[in-house]
C-alpha cells in the first residue's frame, strides 16, 4: 500500500465538521466520532447534545436522497455493495489498528459499515448542499433522536463548530474508515429508533445497524442545510424560535428606538398609515386553518429596501399570545402556525397575509382576513388603510405585557446606567437602550397616541401601586425630559443639572436595593395618607431605581428630596412623589443631597407645581428626571401633553427640552406614561385638603 493510501486510510471523518482527521485528533468517547476541535469548541459537556441535534437535522433533511435505503439489519447485504474504496479503507484500518481500536471495535467497524447500505454511486462531495454545512452537519441522516437541537438556532458558524464537538460515544472501529473513501452518508451514524436523548453508538445494536433504512421521506432531501425556520421536533422549533425571537426583538428594539424621529422623516402617507395602524394595536390574529392558534399584532413600522425609495409595511406579531415570542413578518408567524398545525416542517408559505385572520372587535367573532386589512397596496403605502376595516385595540388581561415592554423598560434602565456611569452604553441587556431624541411630530398627529405601544401602560399596570399618575411613571421610566423651567415659588431648590451629579454612584442594581431599603425605612408624614392612592412604586419606577443615582438615607426632615437624576432618564422620576414632608416617599432614586454634591436638594418648603404653583400631593406628581425643581401636577401635565400632541415626542411639561444627564438629548415621555396620564382626571388629594 502506498504511503498516500496508508495516510488516507488512517484518517477518520469527524461527525460534526466532516473533515478528515488523523487518529490522534479524534475522540471516540461519545456516541459519534468527533475531532478535538469540535469538542473544544462546543465543550465536552454539551457535545452529546450537539451530536443528537446534528443527527436529527441530518435525518429530517433526508441526506440519504438518491441513495439506496440500506440494509434492514446488521447482517443485511448492504455491506456487499459497499464502495471498493470503503472496503479497502476497512482493510487498511484493521491492519493499522488506528485509534487504539481493539479487536472488538474493529469487528464492530465492519458491522458499522454494513449498516451504511448506501448506493455506491454517490461520492463524498456529490451532494450540492451537503458538501459543507455551515453547522458542520454534512447532511447525513442520523439516528432519530429528538434532543433539542441548539444548532438550529445558532449561526452557521456556531453550528459548524458544534459539529466539531458533537462526538457521542461512537464505536471507534466504525469511524476509522477514511472519510475521503466513504460516501458522505457513511460518515454519519445511521438513523435509529432510539428515543430522543438516547445516545447512539454506531453499530451498537440492530436498531443502529439498520440505521440507514430510514424512509426516504425522513432523509431524502439531500439538502444538508436546515432551513432557518424549520425544525424536525418541537424542541428544535423552540430552540429555533429563541434565536429568531432574539433577532426579532433586536429589530423591534431598533424600530422603537428611532421610531419618532424616523417616522417624522418619512413621507406623510407612510407616517399617517403607521399612526393609524399603531392606534389599532394590539389586536388578535389567528391561523386560518386552525383557530386555536392565536397571536397578536402589537407594533408596526416601515422599512425600505436598500437602494429603493419605496417603503414596505413591517408588522411585529407575538405568537402564541403572551409568550413574548416575536415575529417580524406575517409570513414568519404564518409559517410557524402552519408547522404547529400541520406538523409539516418543510413547507414555506408565500404570503402570511392570506393565512392569517384578525378580529375586528374583541369578542365579536368578526374575524377577517389580514390580507383584506393590509392588501399589497396598503403594505406599500400606495393607499390608506380602510377605516371600516381597522380593528379595535384590545389588551388581553391574561397577558398584559406586550413584547415592546421588553424594550421600553430596559431603555429606562439603560439610560439611567449610562448617565450614572459615564461611558456606559446603556445596553445592560438586549433591548436595554438609551432613548434617542427625535423631532417633534406634526401637530396634526397630536390627537393620535401610539396606543399600540401599550407596553408602557402594561408596565404601569403592573406597578404595585397602580401608578395612577402617569407623570410619575414617566419619570420612573426615565424618559428623557425637557430643559428645566424656572423654579416655582416654594421651590428654592437648585436647578443644577443632574449631569453635575457624580457618576460614581452605586451600580443600577445596588441603587435599586438601596432605594428599596430606604423606602422601607422612610418616614414620610404623608405616608398612608395619600388620599387612598397607594404609593406609586410602579415596576417602571423600580426599574428606574436601577439607575446608578446614589441613594441617600431618606431622612431629610420636612423636606422632600427630589430624585437626583444622575443618569439620563434615570428611574427617579416622581412616579414616586418626593415626599414633601420627609424622607423620599417612594422616591425612586432620591439622593441625599449631602451625599451627592451638585445634586439638587429640595428646601423645606412645600412641594408646588412649577406651572400652577399649587401644592403637590407628596406621592403623586410628575418629576422631571433632569431638573429637580421641575415638578408638575397631573392636570398641568395633561394640558402640556395635549398641547404638545401625544403622537410624537412629548417633552418636559415646563415647555423646555431638558437634556438627559451627560448628553444633549432631551428626555421625553414614553407612550405608556402618556396614556396613563391621559387615562383620566384622577382627583388626587392635596396635602392641604382635610
Curated annotation (Swiss-Prot):
Residues 234-245, 254-263 have a biased composition (Basic and acidic residues). InterPro entries: I2BP1/2_C3HC4-RING_sf (IPR044882), Interferon_reg_fac2-bd1_2_Znf (IPR022750). One of its GO terms (molecular function) is zinc ion binding. Signal peptide: none annotated. Residues 59-87, 136-263, 418-564 are annotated as: Disordered. Residues 231-259 form a coiled coil. Its main location: nucleus. Keywords: Coiled coil, Metal-binding, Nucleus, Zinc, Zinc-finger. Pfam families: IRF-2BP1_2, IRF-2BP1_2_M, zf-C3HC4_IRF-2BP1_2. This is Interferon regulatory factor 2-binding protein-like B. It comes from Xenopus laevis.
Amino acid at each position: 500500500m502506498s504511503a498516500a493510501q496508508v495516510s488516507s486510510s488512517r484518517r477518520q471523518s469527524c461527525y460534526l465538521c466532516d473533515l478528515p482527521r488523523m487518529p490522534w485528533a479524534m475522540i471516540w468517547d461519545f456516541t459519534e466520532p468527533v475531532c478535538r476541535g469540535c469538542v473544544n469548541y462546543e465543550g465536552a459537556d454539551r457535545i452529546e447534545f450537539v451530536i443528537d441535534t446534528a443527527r436529527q437535522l441530518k435525518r429530517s433533511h433526508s441526506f440519504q436522497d438518491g441513495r439506496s435505503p440500506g440494509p434492514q439489519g446488521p447482517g443485511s447485504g448492504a455491506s456487499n455493495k459497499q464502495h471498493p474504496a470503503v472496503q479497502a479503507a476497512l482493510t487498511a484500518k484493521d491492519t493499522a489498528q488506528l485509534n487504539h481500536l481493539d479487536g472488538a471495535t474493529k469487528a464492530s467497524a465492519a458491522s458499522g459499515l454494513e449498516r451504511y447500505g448506501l448506493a455506491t454511486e454517490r461520492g463524498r462531495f456529490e451532494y450540492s448542499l451537503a458538501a459543507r454545512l455551515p453547522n458542520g452537519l454534512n447532511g447525513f441522516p442520523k439516528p432519530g433522536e429528538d434532543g433539542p437541537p441548539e444548532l438550529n438556532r445558532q449561526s452557521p458558524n456556531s453550528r459548524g463548530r458544534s459539529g466539531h464537538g458533537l462526538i457521542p460515544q461512537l464505536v471507534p472501529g466504525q469511524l476509522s474508515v477514511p472519510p475521503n473513501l466513504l460516501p458522505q452518508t457513511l460518515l454519519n451514524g445511521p438513523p435509529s429508533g432510539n428515543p430522543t436523548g438516547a445516545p447512539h453508538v454506531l453499530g451498537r445494536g440492530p436498531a443502529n445497524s439498520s440505521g440507514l433504512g430510514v424512509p426516504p421521506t425522513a432523509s431524502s432531501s439531500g439538502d444538508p442545510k436546515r432551513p432557518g425556520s424549520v425544525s424536525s421536533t418541537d424542541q428544535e422549533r423552540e430552540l429555533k424560535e429563541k434565536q429568531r425571537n432574539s433577532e426579532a426583538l433586536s429589530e423591534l428594539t431598533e424600530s422603537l428606538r428611532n421610531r419618532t424621529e424616523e417616522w417624522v422623516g418619512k413621507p406623510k402617507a407612510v407616517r399617517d398609515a403607521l399612526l393609524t395602524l399603531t392606534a389599532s394595536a394590539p389586536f388578535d390574529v389567528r391561523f386560518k386553518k386552525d383557530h386555536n392558534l392565536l397571536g397578536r399584532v402589537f407594533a408596526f413600522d416601515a422599512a425600505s429596501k436598500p437602494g429603493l425609495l419605496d417603503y414596505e409595511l413591517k408588522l411585529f406579531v407575538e405568537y402564541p399570545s403572551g409568550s413574548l415570542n416575536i415575529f417580524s413578518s406575517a409570513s414568519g408567524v404564518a409559517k410557524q402556525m402552519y408547522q404547529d398545525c400541520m406538523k409539516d416542517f418543510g413547507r414555506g408559505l408565500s404570503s402570511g397575509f392570506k393565512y392569517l385572520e384578525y378580529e375586528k372587535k374583541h369578542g365579536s367573532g368578526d374575524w377577517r382576513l389580514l390580507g383584506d386589512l393590509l392588501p399589497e397596496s396598503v403594505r406599500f403605502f400606495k393607499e390608506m388603510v380602510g377605516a371600516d376595516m381597522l380593528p379595535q385595540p384590545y389588551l388581553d388581561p391574561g397577558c398584559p405585557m406586550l413584547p415592546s415592554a421588553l424594550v421600553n423598560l430596559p431603555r429606562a434602565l439603560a439610560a439611567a446606567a449610562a448617565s450614572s456611569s459615564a461611558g456606559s452604553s446603556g445596553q445592560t441587556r438586549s433591548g436595554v437602550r438609551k432613548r434617542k431624541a427625535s423631532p417633534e411630530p406634526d401637530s396634526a398627529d397630536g390627537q393620535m397616541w401610539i396606543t399600540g405601544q401599550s407596553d408602557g401602560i402594561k408596565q404601569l399596570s403592573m406597578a404595585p401601586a397602580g401608578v395612577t399618575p402617569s407623570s410619575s411613571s414617566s419619570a420612573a421610566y426615565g424618559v428623557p425630559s425637557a430643559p428645566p423651567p424656572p423654579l416655582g415659588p416654594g421651590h428654592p431648590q437648585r436647578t443644577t443639572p443632574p449631569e453635575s451629579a457624580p457618576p460614581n454612584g452605586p451600580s443600577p442594581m445596588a441603587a435599586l436595593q438601596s432605594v428599596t431599603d430606604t423606602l422601607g425605612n422612610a418616614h414620610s408624614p404623608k405616608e398612608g395618607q395619600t388620599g387612598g392612592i397607594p404609593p406609586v412604586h410602579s415596576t417602571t419606577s423600580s426599574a428606574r431605581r436601577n439607575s446608578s443615582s446614589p441613594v441617600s438615607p431618606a431622612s431629610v426632615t420636612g423636606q422632600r428630596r427630589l430624585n437626583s437624576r444622575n443618569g439620563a432618564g434615570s428611574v427617579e422620576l416622581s412616579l414616586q412623589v418626593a415626599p414633601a414632608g420627609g424622607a423620599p416617599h417612594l422616591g425612586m432614586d432620591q439622593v441625599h443631597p449631602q451625599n451627592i454634591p451638585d445634586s439638587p436638594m429640595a428646601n423645606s418648603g412645600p412641594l408646588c407645581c412649577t406651572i400652577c404653583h399649587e401644592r403637590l400631593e407628596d406621592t403623586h406628581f410628575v418629576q422631571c428626571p433632569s431638573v429637580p425643581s421641575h415638578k408638575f401636577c397631573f392636570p398641568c401635565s395633561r394640558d402640556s401633553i395635549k398641547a404638545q400632541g401625544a403622537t410624537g415626542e412629548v417633552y418636559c411639561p415646563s415647555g423646555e427640552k431638558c437634556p438627559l444627564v451627560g448628553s444633549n438629548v432631551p428626555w421625553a415621555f414614553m407612550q405608556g406614561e402618556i396614556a396613563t396620564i391621559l387615562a383620566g382626571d384622577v382627583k388626587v388629594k392635596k396635602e392641604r385638603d382635610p
